[in-house]
Design a protein with these regions (language model features):
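Flexible inter-domain linker/hinge segments
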Residues: 123-163, 169, 277, 287, ...
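Short, compositionally biased
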Residues: 15, 102-106, 380-392
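Conserved small/polar residues in nucleotide/adenosyl-binding loops
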Residues: 393-399
Length: 401
């Protein structure tokens, strides 16, 4: 059970937090493996302390990645599972590359892999449903390039690979390609979907209740056919044997890869480099987003310094205040990630986010570490600053005559 959804995203919606459900660990990165007589949680140094605290008494052991001789999940399974045994996982939440590694390593011990089973779903009685939040279209004044132009460029790259179809499962690539955004994952303007680009058409797999008339209009104009979200797996099996599919092994889930009956060409999604090179409109928009965020943060620092000794300001209330100041800026959508407001000793903890249980009051003599960001129509920001609550307005320094 990795930290992933069907699209290999590290940050996922509530429906996909199976690892948290089974282990109690809520960090953004980690993989749980459950055996008959043992269980382990693999994560990196950012989360060792958090994992030990949250998993206390759970029976799940912390496996410290990149420390000493800690085995990888694959190595651990190969050691743990006897010859001729069986390993089961939901192939939709494992990457194609991970699945192939399991095939190679476990296959050497004649271990069977069952990748079309979601055991957590069978025991998670109140599992949250998939998000149904609406999408919105991002106009040319924000993107600087329309859908038709982007599809043309992708098809040119497909031709270089000799591909007749291109399957895209990564949400950021699909959002960039079709110029719409969603709200299926907290703090990220993404929507759960798959895309198949063909020579003359596009198939979009999505919950169409999320689409507004503007998006439907743009999709129709670009010959984008809309299908139910989960139909992708059966439709992938229907791709002709004479077709050539371009897929990105780092961005494609294992189950979808196994559904393909045609020849496969592996390569990075062309959209990755395309969206990395910003056009003039995007560059100007990024500057505007950063200016808006700077205004909000400057107001926040001033507010902390002026009010920490006049009212009770805590880590959580500081987070709320900064979010409110960002919301005053035109074009604000949401925070770009969970606000990390850490005061005093909390500032020494990597990726500390305050909660009702850990929240503390800001006092003179300590330091507030603010690691936050804002999401705007023009772009997203990520900024870290330290603020020291003090009651004086100037410093007197000793001088040497």
């Amino acid at each position: 059970m990795p930290t992933a959804d069907f699209h290999q995203g590290e940050y996922v919606g509530e429906h996909f937090k199976a690892r948290k459900f089974i282990t109690g660990f809520s960090g953004s990165y980690g993989t749980a493996v459950i055996a008959k007589d043992d269980a382990g949680l693999w994560t990196d140094g950012r989360y060792f302390t958090q994992a030990l605290t949250e998993m206390e008494g759970s029976g799940v052991r912390l496996m410290k990645m990149f420390v000493d001789d800690t085995p990888s999940t694959t190595e651990w399974l190969a050691q743990k599972i006897p010859e001729g045994g069986k390993v089961a996982f939901d192939g939709r939440v494992l990457s194609m590359g991970e699945g192939q590694e399991y095939e190679e390593v476990l296959g050497a011990k004649n271990i069977t892999i069952e990748y079309e089973v979601d055991l957590i779903d069978q025991i998670w009685e109140d599992r949250p449903s998939l998000s149904k939040k609406p999408c919105f279209f991002l106009e040319d004044k924000y993107t600087g390039e329309n859908v038709a132009s982007k599809l043309k460029r992708v098809r040119e790259k497909m031709a270089e690979y000799g591909a007749t179809v291109h399957l895209i499962a990564s949400l950021d690539d699909n959002a960039w390609l079709l110029n719409f955004r969603g709200d299926d994952i907290d703090f990220f303007p993404l929507v759960l979907d798959y895309v198949i680009v063909r020579k003359d058409s596009v198939d979009l797999y999505i919950d169409d209740s999320k689409l507004n008339d503007r998006i439907r209009e743009e999709m129709a104009k670009n010959n984008v056919n809309i299908h139910p979200y989960n139909d992708i797996y059966e439709d992938a099996k229907k791709i002709g044997a004479d077709e050539v599919a371009l897929i990105d092994p780092m961005k494609m889930n294992y189950a979808l890869y196994k559904s393909l009956p045609c020849k496969v060409v592996e390569g990075a999604n062309p959209t990755i480099l395309m969206k990395a090179i910003k056009n003039a409109v995007e560059i100007e928009n990024i500057k505007n987003a950063e200016l808006k965020d700077s205004i909000a943060l400057t107001k926040f620092i001033y507010w902390v310094k002026k009010n920490y000794d006049k009212m009770e300001i805590t880590e959580l209330s500081a987070s709320d205040k900064l979010t409110a100041l960002r919301a005053e800026q035109e074009g604000y959508i949401r925070d770009s990630f969970e606000p990390l407001q850490a005061f005093g000793e909390h500032a020494a903890m990597m990726h500390y986010a305050p909660s009702k249980e850990t929240d503390v009051v800001l006092k003179e003599g300590g330091m507030l570490l603010s690691d936050t960001g804002g999401g705007y129509y023009e772009g997203s920001t990520d900024i870290t600053r330290t603020t020291v609550p003090v009651s004086y307005t100037h410093l007197t320094l000793p001088t040497i005559a």
